[in-house]
Amino acid sequence: MKVAVLGAGAWGTALAGHLAARHDTLLWARDAALIAGLQARHENSRYLDGIALPDALRYDADLGAALAHGAADDALCVIAAPVAGLRTLCHAMRDAGCVPAHVVWVCKGFEADTHLLPHQVIAAELPEQQSNGVLSGPSFAREVGRSLPVALTVASASAECRERTLAAFHHGAMRIYTGDDVVGVEVGGAVKNVLAIATGISDGLGLGLNARAALITRGLAEMSRLGVALGGRAETFTGLTGLGDLILTATGDLSRNRTVGLQLAAGRTLNDILGALGHVAEGVRCAQAVLALARAQSIDMPITQAVCGVLFDGIAPRDAVSGLLRRDARAE
């Protein structure tokens, strides 16, 4: 199978390395200098340093060439751009005049200005593209790059897209499950990043494992309420792309969103944290969108509201926690 991976960040690079073990894989990035470095060293020293990439993996800064590769009869196109760049990439794909027949995306979050999920952005920008889906689940790029075990879910309304994605990714240490709840999978992947900031704050303040467990559990309830209101199925949120991804992102030391929370608890400013991080922290980008959607649906999401207060309203982390503890008692 031919596979084109659009986006050479940490996640796109790790997935391309995995795919290249079995398939004719081409990794694209718009940054010619990044591509030149990949071609010379077979390592993404900018985003995934220390991980050797397969010799068979090819690289290109020409989007047209990458799209042609991913548009072959027996091919798959993987969009690994962040949500913030998804619409721009779709524009570029359309302008290139070559939209692959089978597309799967791996980005997580809501578009900041529109509050749209990735599938809604793609439907608006590439309406002719019908065989598509989302690949998501509890996964750190560095561990996938090291070929450590991982389980992911592909969700799509298209059986052909599910089968093609399964054929591409299900090998080696990667196990793929299939489903059709695109909305549920996407909401889980977005909201868990916001909740991971909350658990990072709690851990950074030294509030203990009891508090962490409470935040994860009540956070899962928030995620499920919003997801069901937006059209997802409740059972999706107890699976890999809901609870599984939440546990990993909220507790794993490789989590950028958890790191944001830890650093906020230590008294650092958000601008300083993001500057030092050097990578995307999707929980910061989409927190306000999550809260706005919750309010529009009249859904109570107190943990998300507390995170937004710390990120954007100048509320001290300890005061945000105190506010949660002062909430009226209620039935679970």
UniProtKB/Swiss-Prot annotation:
PROSITE patterns hit by this protein: NAD_G3PDH
Binding-site residues, sn-glycerol 3-phosphate: 108, 137, 139, 192, 245, 255-257
Protein name (database record): Glycerol-3-phosphate dehydrogenase [NAD(P)+]
Taxonomic lineage of the native organism: Bacteria, Pseudomonadati, Pseudomonadota, Betaproteobacteria, Burkholderiales
Main subcellular localisation: cytoplasm
Keywords tagged on the record: Cytoplasm, Lipid biosynthesis, Lipid metabolism, NAD, NADP, Nucleotide-binding, Oxidoreductase, Phospholipid biosynthesis, Phospholipid metabolism
Species for this entry: Burkholderia orbicola (strain MC0-3)
Active-site positions on this chain: 192 (proton acceptor)
Keyword ATP-binding: no
